[in-house]
Amino acid sequence: DPEMSRGLGDVYKRQMKRIAIAALSAVILQGVTPLDSLNVYASENTGASYTALDLYTYIQDQCSTEYTLTEKAETFLEEHDDLFPASTELVIPDEMIDAELDFRHINKNPSRYGDKLMRISDAYVIQVQEEEIEEGHYLTWLNLIDGEEQQYSVYYNGELDDVFEDDTVEVTGLPLGTSSFENTEGGDTLVVVLAGCRVNNID
């Protein structure tokens, strides 16, 4: 019954929202300034004056969910600049995606990962923000929670015109590391940080 499915979907979203708000204080991009200091290698993929590796190296200690790039992630970003972001025409080979990889693996030992992409299905968008980091080039940040109530911080090198707060998305991205932030209850919320490769609104 489509009506019942829609109703259950709304209940699920409200539940996710409640969990997220209970655990989360406002998190925003902080101090991300134009990347004037980088301009070393232009990206053929985006036309920006910085590559994906430049970007994710630069923002790791400039963003609200600070992280430390793993060596494997650095290598992957350098070798696959065309995936960040991936155009709609680009087919991502199955062997580049670890279908078994999830939050638990990365949280346990981030340094073991970053040489393959991961996919998060049915992730709920808690927050989404966009920041201009070079004239005409934007960074989009998404704070997501999945069905297991695990949270992700996704930095997407570009604009996501059809993705908004309260939407449900499927994300393909590269695990860069882990981070945490203080939640409203005084504890720490752990997040896995991803470089967004592709983000699809599935609502």
Please name every model-derived segment.
Residues 41-203:
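OB-fold and OB-like single-stranded nucleic-acid-recognition modules
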Residues 1-15:
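Single conserved hydrophobic/aromatic residue that forms the stacking wall/gate
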Residues 14-40:
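Sec-dependent N-terminal signal peptides of Gram-positive bacterial secreted proteins and lipoproteins
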Residues 3-6, 26, 38, 44:
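Compositionally biased regions
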